[in-house]
Amino acid sequence: MRKWMIVAAVAAVFGLSACNNGDSEVIVKTKDGNITKEEFYNEMKARVGKEVIRDLVHEKVLSKKYKVTDKEIDKEIENLKEMYGTQYDLVVQQNGEKAIRDMVKLDLLRQKAAMEDIKVTDKELKDYYKNYKPKIRASHILVKDEKTAEEIKTKLDKGEDFAKLAKQYSQDPGSAPNGGDLGWFGPGKMVKEFEDAAYKLKVGQVSDPVKTDYGYHIIKVTDKEEKKPFNEMKEEIEFEVKQSKLDPAKVQSKVEKLIKDAKVEIEDKDLQDVLK
């Protein structure tokens, strides 16, 4: 999260790239004194300039050799939304979608660089496909006690509206206002008891109460992705299998080698030790 904030904050610094030493253009006026473009630039550079220069160098060098598509970025964004929930929305409000997409793109470029040296077998890919479960979309009603859960299930069995009952009874503040909708999720995103029960349901089917550490859930699956044939998914599966084998040390080592080979020269004396 902090990285996204840094990217957004320093965008202003590089928006002032035309600014040179001695630029006295005033950007803030107060009765106690003004703030010039030069003062702003120097302060921002001192605070976060090294991190941003490093990221810009990485993006420039890696983009020459590796490509990241909008579709790949979109997929990672969806994963982040699932992972961070409402915190993700807060970061978007504070920093903007573009800053987040830029950081996701850079992370993917670094990963692709490191993945180049990772080998996977056809058996690994087929085993992954065999166990692969597509995403599903579900809603739930969460209550603390089994008795209430059973009473709600009885109402549902009699034809009462799921979304209406979720708004009325569910104690999940994140989903209750939306009729219990949890959005799309895949394996590993929910607690095991919830996931196991949800994946057994057909679209439109409602579960009996499911007990987890959070309480009792009544789950309704509202949509399911289809599992595509292996050949259509092979490239995506290969990426995910390689991604699962990555570790920070491999990524750092590969990127450092590529940066060294690119013979980067930093002219600003204040930032010359960034890549060391």
Swiss-Prot record:
Its main location: membrane. Gene3D superfamilies: 3.10.50.40, Trigger factor, C-terminal domain. Keywords: Cell membrane, Isomerase, Lipoprotein, Membrane, Palmitate, Rotamase, Signal. Pfam families: Rotamase_3 (PF13616), Trigger_C (PF05698). The keyword Cell division does not apply. Its EC number is 5.2.1.8. This is Foldase protein PrsA. It comes from Geobacillus sp. (strain WCH70).
